[in-house]
Structure formats: structure tokens, C-alpha cells
């Protein structure tokens, strides 16, 4: 047996804390543990920091769809590709609040608002800040994703009372340039630093199933875990099939057990993060989702649509959580 695997297996058996400064080799040794040992370590980390029978429920709305100048090779909203998606203007605040109220009535406790921009213009940011303030007035947590931010942008959002800012790193540093060329990984990391400096919590994760290697998935986790403060929320997305984008030619759905292993590894590496089982759940069986929750995933998006792709029906989610004895709400 490899020495690194022996060390990780020993830690799984005695409950010792895994170090905070990670490299891909350590993450791979953890990921490759015998399944029961990995799940045990993930459960220990999960139970130490969260109620293991509870998931956070969030809702996601595209407040400005399509026409994005970035060339992210996985995205239906990029203006670089003919995906058949019609670009829209920024929604009115009243319409956003009405949607948030419906999401709250359906059980969501966090409302996430996404705009397909490279970076927000000042007048648009003012409108988003009004939305944040109004949604918070409903008693919901707020999250927005608006592209890259300057320190001034982040400070303005903090002043509006924003709880979370989502800005995914998407994949490993090594695979990044194969899917995006118009925005560097450092641009993303700089935005995360501006958000953190403004006192806003970070939501940051990535996408799997784009043709990347297992080492790329783990490299993404290492990047996140080694940030000065790792994200409070880590969404793991399965790529949703979108016709007309470059990733369509390289995509390969991950093996279900590989997904569970990745979630368990994320849970151990970032034990205090909310790990969100995000896009792609409509392709998963109930049994797979149950394993994902057992691995430490403790957040989902509820609602029939995620931006431009489908999501499990609300009734299906409610039935699954009830059968598992899992409550939902704020994490």
C-alpha cells in the first residue's frame, strides 16, 4: 500500500485532523482511501461542524441572462457561441422580489441572483444593491454573482448588506485555460480577495464532467482549501449538456462513485464549509443523492430551473428529504 494512503487511512481510523495546507498528492491519497474509510472521515468532519440530518436550501435566479462577453466553454450564456439563448435586460427589482417570495414560500432560505456580465456597471450595481436590500427584507440570506469586482464594487455590495458573493474558480489551474481564455484564474482570485476584504462571505466552487482529469477536480479543491480563508460555501456542479459550446465535444459525465468521493474529499479538506450539491441533480438517482448527503453535501438548490437549465422538481426534493429524515432551511 502507498505510504500516503497508509497515513490517510490511519487518520481516518483515529480521527486526527488533516493538515490545512494541501497539495494534490495529499488530496489524491485522501480521495483514494477505501470507500468506507473515506466516508467515515467525511462523516466525522461533517458531524463535528454541522447537523448531519439537515441541508441548506437555496434558490437561484438569473436576473440578467445571456450576452456575456466571456468565452467560458461550458456556458450557454456566452455571446461567443450559438446556443439559441436569447439575451435579456436586467430584471426589475419588483419582479425579483416577487420571485424571491415564491422561493421562500417553497422552502428556500437563501436567494441567489446571477447576472451574465464580465463586470457590473455602476448603474446596474445600484439596481442589484436595491434587490439585495429588498430580498433581505423578506428574511432571506442573499447571494449574487456578477462577474469580476473591484474593491469599490465589493464595498458597495457590503454596504447593501450582501451576505455571500459567488465567483467560482471552475476547475484546476492546469485545466483552466482549456475552457476559458477571456478571464484569467488570477482575475477570479483577485475578486475573491476583494470580496473577503469587504467582509462578504464567499461562495466558490467549480464544475466537473467537462473532460478534466480526477487530478484537476482535486486541484480545484486544493486551490480552494489553500485560500487564506477557504470559502464558507462550496458548490460542486455537474456540467449540464448544452448544445453549441466547446465543452460539448470533451464532456464526460463523472462516475457516480467518483462524485461521492469528491464530495467527501471536499468535506474533509474544508470541514466548516457548506458543500452544495449544485447543478446536475436532475440526472441523479435518489440513491446517489443520498450517498452525496452521507459524504457531507449539505446544501441544494430548490426550484425547477437553475439559470438556463433544469433542476429537480420541488415535490421530488421534498419527498426525498422526507424519506431520508433530513430537515431543510438555514445551514
Curated annotation (Swiss-Prot):
[2Fe-2S] cluster binds at residues 112, 143, 203, 276. Keywords: 2Fe-2S, 4Fe-4S, Biotin biosynthesis, Iron, Iron-sulfur, Metal-binding, S-adenosyl-L-methionine, Transferase. The keyword Iron-sulfur applies. Residues 53-272 form the Radical SAM core domain. Its cofactor is [4Fe-4S] cluster; [2Fe-2S] cluster. Pathway: Cofactor biosynthesis; biotin biosynthesis; biotin from 7,8-diaminononanoate: step 2/2. Its EC number is 2.8.1.6. It holds the Pfam family Radical_SAM. SMART domains: BATS, Elp3. Gene3D superfamilies: Aldolase class I. It catalyses: (4R,5S)-dethiobiotin + (sulfur carrier)-SH + 2 reduced [2Fe-2S]-[ferredoxin] + 2 S-adenosyl-L-methionine = (sulfur carrier)-H + biotin + 2 5'-deoxyadenosine + 2 L-methionine + 2 oxidized [2Fe-2S]-[ferredoxin]. InterPro entries: Aldolase_TIM (IPR013785), BATS_dom (IPR010722), Biotin_synth/BioAB (IPR002684), Biotin_synthase (IPR024177), Elp3/MiaA/NifB-like_rSAM (IPR006638), rSAM (IPR007197). [4Fe-4S] cluster binds at residues 68, 72, 75. One of its GO terms (biological process) is biotin biosynthetic process. It is an enzyme of class 2 (transferase). The keyword Endoplasmic reticulum does not apply. Binds 1 [4Fe-4S] cluster. The cluster is coordinated with 3 cysteines and an exchangeable S-adenosyl-L-methionine. Binds 1 [2Fe-2S] cluster. The cluster is coordinated with 3 cysteines and 1 arginine. GO terms for molecular function: 2 iron, 2 sulfur cluster binding; 4 iron, 4 sulfur cluster binding; biotin synthase activity; iron ion binding. Belongs to the radical SAM superfamily. Biotin synthase family. Catalyzes the conversion of dethiobiotin (DTB) to biotin by the insertion of a sulfur atom into dethiobiotin via a radical-based mechanism. PANTHER family: BIOTIN SYNTHASE, BIOTIN SYNTHASE, MITOCHONDRIAL. Homodimer. This is Biotin synthase. The gene is bioB.
